[in-house]
A protein has these predicted regions:
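Intrinsically disordered, low-complexity regions enriched in acidic/Ser/Thr/Pro/Gln residues
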Residues: 2-158, 162-165
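Short, basic/aromatic-enriched C-terminal tail that caps enzymatic domains
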Residues: 246-256
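Feature captures the catalytic cores and cofactor-binding loops of soluble hydro-lyases/lyases
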Residues: 171-248
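A general structural motif
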Residues: 137, 141-149, 167-179, 197-199
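Short acidic/polar capping segments at secondary-structure boundaries
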Residues: 110, 161, 170, 200-201, ...
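Solvent-exposed, non-transmembrane amphipathic alpha-helical segments
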Residues: 83, 97, 150-157, 180, ...
Length: 256
């Protein structure tokens, strides 16, 4: 990876500043460090992503604590509830309120977490459409370019359009936020693919499955439990997706 992925050097003063515009609302902060190399040591100022602990409270009960970026919190709550199988969809969520470091959620009825359904879908995607989404994943990852400290997730529509894009310090929360954002916009996830930068573990595959995606793709590696779950559910799972190749571990019939 080229040196400029994280920061651009400026001779005077000795600081790192990213190529991205300085957005005062972005979840990062400047901090000092010492660079040690064959040329010796020097003081630098770099940007780092902000991580905060957010508590998820559902119907008066704390169910989870997430370490994530303190942004897009409604999307996080909606996506988390759907991806964890706690609600069927946004219509089952009565309200989401942010109170300090907590997200207070109310829902209609209850649903068990292991609500997996075998995928029955005729959705198909061309590799070039997927590679185009991966290119956009890199282009839109502005906080990653400033800090090197985030994962990204993108909801890719059947025709190649982008339903949502989110970054987070947590790969799970990036997926939750992308799902929540797409659902709040009324997107039918059964006609979409989840594109992400994180490893495809069973946790991530389970989230994607509960949300209703037939296809999940990552530019990173899969894990065996994630592959096994995708096969059991009839999902398409592809990883190491980097132009001009991707490796399909389950459901290759959906990739044209």
């Amino acid at each position: 990876m080229k040196e400029s992925w994280h920061a651009d050097r400026i001779e005077e003063p000795e600081e790192f500043w990213q190529e991205e515009r300085l957005d005062p609302s972005a979840a990062f902060q400047a901090t000092g460090c010492i660079e040690i190399s064959g040329k010796g040591r020097r003081k630098l100022k770099v940007d780092v992503a902000i991580e905060e602990r957010i508590k998820i409270v559902i119907d008066g009960t704390a169910v989870a604590e997430l370490f994530c970026l303190p942004s897009e919190l409604e999307e996080l709550a909606v996506g988390f509830l759907v991806c964890e199988g706690l609600v069927e969809g946004p219509a089952d969520i009565v309200s989401v309120q942010s109170e300090g470091k907590s997200l207070i959620c109310e829902r209609r009825g209850q649903r068990g977490e292991e609500n997996f359904h075998r995928v029955v879908s005729d959705l198909k995607m061309n590799p070039e459409t997927i590679f185009g989404a991966l290119d956009l994943l890199n282009q839109e990852a502005r906080l990653w370019r400033r800090t090197g400290g985030t994962h990204s997730a993108l909801v890719l529509r059947e025709g190649g359009g982008i339903a949502s894009f989110c970054e987070d310090v947590s790969r799970s929360s990036a997926v939750d936020k992308a799902v929540g954002s797409a659902l709040l916009a009324g997107t039918d996830l059964s006609r979409c693919a989840m594109i992400t930068t994180g490893r495809l573990s069973s946790v991530i595959v389970a989230k994607v499955a509960r949300a209703g995606f037939p296809i999940v793709v990552s530019r990173a590696a899969p894990l065996n439990a994630g592959i096994d779950l995708a096969k059991r559910l009839g999902m398409t799972l592809a990883a190491f997706a980097r132009r001009p190749k991707l490796h399909v571990y389950s459901g290759d019939g959906r990739i044209l």
